[in-house]
Swiss-Prot record:
Transmembrane spans: none
GO molecular function: hydrolase activity
Family the UniProt entry places it in: Belongs to the CwlJ family.
Primary subcellular site in the record, as a coarse category: secreted
Protein name, UniProt field: Cell wall hydrolase CwlJ
Origin superkingdom: Bacteria
GO cellular component, one term: extracellular region
Keywords: Cell wall biogenesis/degradation, Germination, Hydrolase, Secreted, Sporulation
Length: 141
């Protein structure tokens, strides 16, 4: 069962975002970026109180994804990426992104905190940051 409402266009949109943000980190990295995005749709806390759809999440401004400003994001999603997006929408979670709401790619080590949120792990190039369960209980359900 899907963890967020969606249509086929949103599955492809999520797939394009996952590829544009983390293709260099492979399938697992793309799944983690997808986890972070879906967590933003599920959450109604912190930076994401009015994000209720995949489309809202992908194009959130300010605070959205840098990849949406680059041409590569607008290329059609491949079937393999669409399959990964479906897995995330169905609720598959990958550590350290299981409860994350933010990620970024630093040049060096992951900062312990990023905008007041704690680092929960790194996968290849990306550092992941999660809220506390007290601040954002929806992403811990």
């Amino acid at each position: 069962m899907a963890v967020v409402k969606h249509n086929e266009a949103e599955v492809e949109l999520l797939a394009r975002l996952m590829r544009a943000e983390a293709e260099g980190d492979g399938d697992l990295g793309m799944l983690m970026v997808g986890n972070t995005g879906i967590n933003r749709v599920i959450a109604s806390c912190l930076d994401f109180p009015n994000i209720r759809t995949i489309t809202n999440m992908v194009y959130q401004s300010p605070g959205g994804f840098e990849a949406t400003q680059k041409g590569y994001f607008y290329q059609r999603a491949r079937q393999s990426e669409i399959r990964l997006a479906r897995r995330v929408i169905q609720g598959e979670r990958q550590h350290p992104a299981s409860n994350s709401l933010w990620f970024f790619m630093p040049e060096g080590a992951c900062p312990e905190q990023w905008y007041g949120q704690w680092n929960v792990g790194r996968y290849k190039a990306h550092c992941f940051y999660a809220p506390t369960a007290a601040d954002c209980p929806e992403v811990f359900r």
